[in-house]
Amino acid sequence: MVALVAPQAFAIWPELRRLWRLLRIVLHIFYGLLLATVIGAFWRPYRPLVQRATSHWLRCLLDILAVRMEVNGVPQQGTAFLVSNHVSWLDIPLIGVQRSVHFLSKAEVRDWPLIGLLARAVGTLFIRRGSGESQSKSVEIAQHLKLGRTILVFPEGTTTDGRSVKRFFSQLFAAPTLADVPIQPLALRYLDSNGQLDPALAFVGDDEFHLHLWQMLRRDQVVVRLSWGEPMAANGDRDQLARQAHGAVLAMLGS
């Protein structure tokens, strides 16, 4: 009888652990909303206090998700325009724990339950894809850069499975030129237990957030390699800068 029960107990354990992690995430989101309210993040999202609280909250989130990071290189000191390949919704917290940064996100995120509130609390800039507002958004980003706020963008405009990097849209590369701040490329690579690329961790196509998260919660560990490239001077036209940054990201993923 014992021999029959024991395997079932072992089979249940991963599901219990997954449910426990999910509960912790829900509680952590509510904690984040409470923290954002207490420190006034919804009204003044760009204060240093909010940035420190954001880094703390993101680090705790990665701990809940059992994320282990391998970091190569160092982030640019001071203000920078960060550009990265885009694989998953997890990209943002991974980069956010490395340095103080504000994000450019698709407009739909603003309306996500709870997550949208948190995004607004940390000063996220939203853009509607295909709306033709990239030019005006470049000017807005440049204004933030001039105020000393580092901005992260994903120039592919979508996510991939990590096997390749799509062409970088160049419109937003006008922002660092207008603000005269360096561009720093970075590369994200999600790995399996053998250190090889793991496309299963990508959030692509018609993937739904809650289903993707549910699958991720079953993993013992999520391993991500984040590589910081050499900063680039924002000289030249935006198409040239986009190609140069794209090449730098490809080179880091191939290393």
Q: Predicted regions: what is each one?
A:
Residues 1-9, 64, 68-72, 92, ...:
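Soluble, non-transmembrane catalytic domains of enzymes that act on hydrophobic metabolites at membranes
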Residues 3-70, 117-121, 219:
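A transmembrane-helix-recognition feature enriched in membrane-embedded lipid enzymes
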Residues 32-44, 48, 62-64, 77-132:
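Catalytic core of membrane glycerolipid acyltransferases/transacylases, capturing the structured
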Residues 79-81, 148-154, 182:
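Residue-level preference for the first positions of well-ordered beta-strands
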Residues 114-116, 163-244:
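A cross-family acyltransferase "interaction/gating" segment
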Residues 124-145, 150:
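A membrane-cytosol interface segment of integral membrane proteins
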Residues 141-142, 149-173:
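Soluble extracytoplasmic domains of inner/organellar membrane proteins
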